[in-house]
């Protein structure tokens, strides 16, 4: 009867359900004489590639599509879908851009290559109160408040609500923040660039305009894996991609895997799931020992789901395994040395047992800068590993990737 949300920890079967549901909806539509128009999407390209493999394995005869409006199942990241929409809109996006970002831009497909917010802060930061002189704060305010509400003027910004932001802004502070936002928009216009979030917002607004003119929305069903890290602009695009109705939106999420710490409430973006939410508590991937170790960390915090409800994190697991090993290091060199020793030990054990799958061993890090430093540091210690970003995990070496890129993937060690 409308959008549905399932939640659960890593290994509880959320992705399995999403994949089976996509295949079942495609079969059901085909049996009913309707062309399947289904989007199965997630946050990163790595996960999208993995989802496509799983769908093809479950139903080899299923038709995939790479183009909007064609029959079949599209498996893609949302950023890529937004670009398809903007390519279709062409220069006609200008009036939409005026409405969404306050400037009638005709070219919106080029991304910024540098931190424009930091550049703007260096120019206008002196006019901001000390507690607001942060590029991260300005970017977050823009993406969480300004873009979702399509604020184009100072007068609009002075009136809007800012729930959940944690920083109160009076009129004087809002005016100072708005000067920075205007500076950002002017600078990106000069550079001819448009951010990912702006592209998502523009694509959503374009689809809403087309629907108001009687144009059908691109999909009949949209399914989302790893929904907890989607931004407001992502959620607005999801809502715009499919007409409200039975089986329109399906979201799988886990608040404990939220990387960016920005709490989002689905109902604020037209996605009503009240009465259509289910929680999975049986963990098929993680051992009891790993769960116990994780609970020791999670018990120190409080978590909310995508409807703003407090979320408990007690899961059960039928699997048992070794206790997690926590290694203490005095500095980065010591840390790399211990990591190299452990990787060498594991690879040697695999060779002795006849197992040839080094790519099933992963080193997870905080960001891409640490990733590159770890790859170089391990190479200096004669351990060859492979850095993984947007590309698929290759064979032949252990992999090093950020927690962001590892989301939803599974490794042996």
Features from the language model and the residues they span:
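A general alpha-helix detector
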Residues: 119-124, 141, 183-184, 202, ...
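Tryptophan-centered motif/residue detector
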Residues: 116-118, 141-146, 178, 235, ...
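Short glycine-rich substrate-engagement loop in P-loop NTPases that contacts/grips substrate
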Residues: 193-201
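ATP-hydrolysis module of ASCE/P-loop NTPase motor domains
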Residues: 91-173
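Conserved helicase motor core of SF1/SF2 NTP-dependent helicases
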Residues: 4-36, 43-58, 62-71, 76-93, ...
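Pre-Walker A adenine-sensing motif
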Residues: 1
